[in-house]
Amino acid sequence: MKSTSKIYTDKDSNLDVIKGKRIAVLGYGSQGRAWAQNLRDSGLNVVVGLEREGKSWELAKSDGIIPLHTKDAVKDADIIIFLVPDMVQRTLWLESVQPYMKKGADLVFAHGFNIHYKLIEPPKDSDVYMIAPKGPGPTVREYYKAGGGVPALVAIQQDVSGTALRKALAIAKGIGATRAGVIPTTFKEETETDLFGEQVILVGGIMELMKAAFETLVEEGYQPEVAYFETINELKMLVDLVYEKGITGMLKAVSDTAKYGGMTVGKFVINEDVRKRMKEALQRIKSGKFAEEWVEEYGRGMPTVVNGLSQVQNSLEEKIGNQLKDLIQKGKPKS
């Protein structure tokens, strides 16, 4: 088992490394808005690059950030930060960034997908690095404003200047990440572990586990409302406990009956066959097969995603959940 020997913090980073450089943040969604405002509030020179004038354009202006068309934002930029969705980045790169960026400008990413799978092939004279906050954009902004920060990963793909890590840590400091801690990784490791986590637990695994448990109870004659509470609604409380106190803390917080049942039946359900399938899923990611399939799916208008979302929206568990929302919300204390 490999473990990092270094976690970078504020004392390892210096904003002076990028002071005076023009930073173009491409995109003004969840992460883009947070990064642009945090970097601006850290005293850095920031503009936002957008493909068209619209809601994001007006939002940036109202936040006091200068919005420009992408090609205008990148032409004078020393540092170009890609904060648009993965599947938009290649087209944006080919049409609005590569033809207009100045020679030697840094390319920065928050996720390694496009670089790792070679959907974007950067110039040989550019530093290429990544800062990947381990939290959503609004949290990155909220923590920064409160004097804290969201932990992040940092990776260097190309270090032409010899100062790529210093610049990456300066960007990380600018968004508040070094206040918490920044862990070194690689584009390969970040991409593959991120995709794996999404597929087998955070989205795919949890979704199918909840669905299977709910349907098992309903098929055996239990009330759907009761099944929903026991297999879906209570998940948040357990996840919050794990987030705040770790798995041990969660186990200490639940009943002895729950501990015993979880420790015995959990391994029966998540058995060696499931672990084997997890390794197969990881191999699809490592081989590039998943990326190849996803690029093709996206190009066809995402029929699998559209159909899957429709099935979820029309499922019994979703209908029951919607019916119970008022009941669930009614019990929340007034803030």
UniProtKB/Swiss-Prot annotation:
Residue ranges of domain KARI N-terminal Rossmann in the record: 5-185
Keyword Metal-binding carried by entry: yes
Entry keywords, A to Z: Amino-acid biosynthesis, Branched-chain amino acid biosynthesis, Magnesium, Metal-binding, NADP, Oxidoreductase
Catalyzed reactions per annotation: (2R)-2,3-dihydroxy-3-methylbutanoate + NADP(+) = (2S)-2-acetolactate + NADPH + H(+); (2R,3R)-2,3-dihydroxy-3-methylpentanoate + NADP(+) = (S)-2-ethyl-2-hydroxy-3-oxobutanoate + NADPH + H(+)
Annotated binding of Mg(2+) 2, by residue: D194, E230, E234
Record keyword Acetylation present: no
Cofactor: Mg(2+)
Residues that bind NADP(+): Y28, G29, S30, Q31, S56, D86, M87, V88, Q89, G137
Protein residues bound to Mg(2+) 1: D194, E198
Domain of life, source organism: Archaea
Pfam families noted in UniProt: KARI_C, KARI_N
Catalytic-site annotation from UniProt: H111
GO process terms (BP): isoleucine biosynthetic process; L-valine biosynthetic process
EC number: 1.1.1.86
Domain KARI C-terminal knotted: 186-331
Residue numbers binding substrate: S255
Free-text cofactor note: Binds 2 magnesium ions per subunit.
InterPro entries, per the entry: 6-PGluconate_DH-like_C_sf, KARI, KARI_C, KARI_N, KARI_prok, NAD(P)-bd_dom_sf
Molecular function GO labels: ketol-acid reductoisomerase activity; magnesium ion binding; NADP binding
Enzyme class: oxidoreductase
Listed pathway(s): Amino-acid biosynthesis; L-isoleucine biosynthesis; L-isoleucine from 2-oxobutanoate: step 2/4; Amino-acid biosynthesis; L-valine biosynthesis; L-valine from pyruvate: step 2/4
General function of this protein: Involved in the biosynthesis of branched-chain amino acids (BCAA). Catalyzes an alkyl-migration followed by a ketol-acid reduction of (S)-2-acetolactate (S2AL) to yield (R)-2,3-dihydroxy-isovalerate. In the isomerase reaction, S2AL is rearranged via a Mg-dependent methyl migration to produce 3-hydroxy-3-methyl-2-ketobutyrate (HMKB). In the reductase reaction, this 2-ketoacid undergoes a metal-dependent reduction by NADPH to yield (R)-2,3-dihydroxy-isovalerate.
Entry similarity comment: Belongs to the ketol-acid reductoisomerase family.
Protein name (database record): Ketol-acid reductoisomerase (NADP(+))
Organism: Saccharolobus islandicus (strain L.S.2.15 / Lassen #1) (Sulfolobus islandicus)
Gene: ilvC
